[in-house]
């Protein structure tokens, strides 16, 4: 939707980033390293784009707060909720299947000792096994509209 409105958008997939950096573990140290690496990469490129959208599992408050501090009012989180049952059903990478067989350990939300650490920061919550893609994406677009109004002087993006 943003590209259709001629915004320059960069999408970053945390899993692809993880592979490029050859980070294969899901322990706390590796998660922090991967998330900080993504944040530092974004810091180098964000001025070239109107929006940088990152999809990454970021369960640790420390890294999310670091990103918020680094990017300030240009940062907001989308917390995606989904049941393990639904995640397993959708799992195109077969991560949950591998986790069930202990091929992968510490898969966040499944067999991990790492839990999601809550922050006081207000974020968008989308519940992808209870909401349609349209409802979830509209929540994000509404936040972007608000963000644009605050930062750019009452401009409103219209998405249908």
What are these regions (language model features)?
Residues 1-40:
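Conserved substrate/cofactor phosphate-moiety recognition/catalytic segment
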Residues 19, 62, 85-87:
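Generic structural signal for helix capping and beta-alpha/helix-loop junctions
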Residues 71-76, 119-123:
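Short glycine-/polar-rich loops that comprise or flank the Walker A/P-loop
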Residues 81-84, 89-139, 146-155:
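Small-molecule kinase domains that catalyze NTP-dependent phosphoryl transfer to phosphate-bearing small molecules
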């Amino acid at each position: 939707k943003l590209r259709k409105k001629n915004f320059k958008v960069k999408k970053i997939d945390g899993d692809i980033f993880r592979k490029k950096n050859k980070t294969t573990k899901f322990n706390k140290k590796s998660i922090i390293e991967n998330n900080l690496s993504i944040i530092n990469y974004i810091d180098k490129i964000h001025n070239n784009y109107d929006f940088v959208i990152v999809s990454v599992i970021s369960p640790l408050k420390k890294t999310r707060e670091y990103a918020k501090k680094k990017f300030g009012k240009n940062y907001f989180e989308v917390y995606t909720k989904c049941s393990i049952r639904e995640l397993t059903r959708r799992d195109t990478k077969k991560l949950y299947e591998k986790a069930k067989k202990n091929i992968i350990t510490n898969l966040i939300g499944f067999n991990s000792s790492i839990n999601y650490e809550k922050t006081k920061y207000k974020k968008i919550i989308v519940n992808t096994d209870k909401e349609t893609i349209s409802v979830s994406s509209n929540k994000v677009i509404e936040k972007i509209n608000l963000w644009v109004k605050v930062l750019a002087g009452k401009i409103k993006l219209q998405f249908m």
